[in-house]
């Protein structure tokens, strides 16, 4: 059995989960998420727990078992606690600022780069060099943080660029002279 799939999902008291066939809606204090999950999986919902049950031990069902459980658990965690990704801007003159709900990055290009805020996603800037991406969908938060990082990924010679907080950037030595 899948190690991830067989774990039971605990539901906090302030979160409600409703199933309509294979479509699930999760409501909590931070918002509401809905998604269509794998139609082969079944869900056993008790008072404050949900168990994902697979129909057979075929390879396809085994792989989808853990994925379905992880997606459902991420939705429950998102509406109850939310997700945060923190990015750091490293480099001389690199800075971030808010313009309404959107994020403006000055990262060494001839023009500022504007990142639009998506639905259920908020940005916050601390000390002009630290950007927080917050939201209820783990998938959206991670994708938007990755898009921001891809504007100027950290380079290996000086370490300049946009990196995740705590990310290790492998450094290289420059060319040696004659």
UniProtKB/Swiss-Prot annotation:
Signal peptide: none annotated. Keywords: Ribonucleoprotein, Ribosomal protein, RNA-binding, rRNA-binding. The keyword Lyase does not apply. Belongs to the universal ribosomal protein uL6 family. Part of the 50S ribosomal subunit. The keyword Transmembrane helix does not apply. The lineage of its organism: Bacteria, Bacillati, Bacillota, Bacilli, Bacillales. This is Large ribosomal subunit protein uL6. One of its GO terms (molecular function) is structural constituent of ribosome. GO terms for biological process: cytoplasmic translation.
């Amino acid at each position: 059995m899948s190690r991830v799939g067989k774990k039971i999902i605990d539901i906090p008291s302030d979160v409600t989960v409703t199933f309509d066939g294979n479509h699930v809606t999760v409501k909590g204090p931070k918002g509401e998420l809905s998604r269509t999950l794998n139609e082969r999986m079944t869900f056993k919902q008790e008072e404050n727990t949900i168990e994902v049950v697979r129909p057979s031990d075929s390879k396809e069902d085994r792989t989808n078992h853990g994925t379905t459980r992880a997606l459902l658990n991420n939705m429950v965690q998102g509406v109850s606690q939310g997700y945060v990704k923190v990015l750091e801007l490293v480099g001389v003159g690199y800075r971030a600022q808010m313009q309404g709900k959107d994020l403006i990055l000055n990262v060494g290009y001839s023009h500022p780069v504007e990142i639009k805020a998506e639905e259920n996603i908020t940005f916050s800037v601390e000390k002009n060099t630290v950007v927080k991406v917050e939201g209820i969908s783990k998938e959206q938060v991670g994708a938007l943080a990755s898009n921001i990082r891809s504007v100027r990924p950290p380079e290996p010679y000086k370490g300049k660029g946009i990196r995740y907080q705590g990310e290790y950037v492998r450094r290289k030595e420059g060319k040696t002279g004659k």
